[in-house]
UniProtKB/Swiss-Prot annotation:
Belongs to the asfivirus MGF 110 family. The keyword Signal applies. Plays a role in virus cell tropism, and may be required for efficient virus replication in macrophages. This is Protein MGF 110-2L. Pfam families: v110. The keyword Signal applies. Residues 1-31 form the signal peptide. Induction: Expressed in the early phase of the viral replicative cycle. Keywords: Early protein, Signal. It comes from the Viruses.
Length: 104
């Protein structure tokens, strides 16, 4: 029975990780990534065909389909730590592990 409670905790942790989306990055992560990969779609907010960079405020607006915006994904390296009956997840952001998915 104890095995199933551990399994439930582990699955709950995995479920919370699946909820991560680059559409809603934390502000400090958004600042970091958008300094280096300015063409990632998550760095831009678009309305009525005009897009403004969320981080680089001095950058001028661009037309939505005239700037090469790509769908990007950020990958993290995670490890699971068991502390008695509780599992914790620790993730580190890897700077060199941003994958661009062109035309996704």
């Amino acid at each position: 029975m104890r095995f199933f409670s551990y399994l439930g905790l582990l699955l709950a942790g995995l479920t919370s990780l699946q909820g991560f989306s680059t559409d809603n990055l934390l502000e400090e992560e958004l600042r970091y990534w958008c300094q280096y990969v300015k063409n990632c779609r998550f760095c831009w907010t678009c309305q009525d065909g005009l897009c403004k960079n969320k981080v680089l405020k001095d950058m001028s607006s661009v037309q939505e389909h005239s700037y090469p915006m790509e769908h990007c994904m950020i990958h993290r390296q995670c490890k699971y730590i068991r502390d008695g009956p509780i599992f914790q997840v620790e993730c580190t952001m890897q700077t060199s592990d941003a994958t661009h998915l062109i035309n996704a």
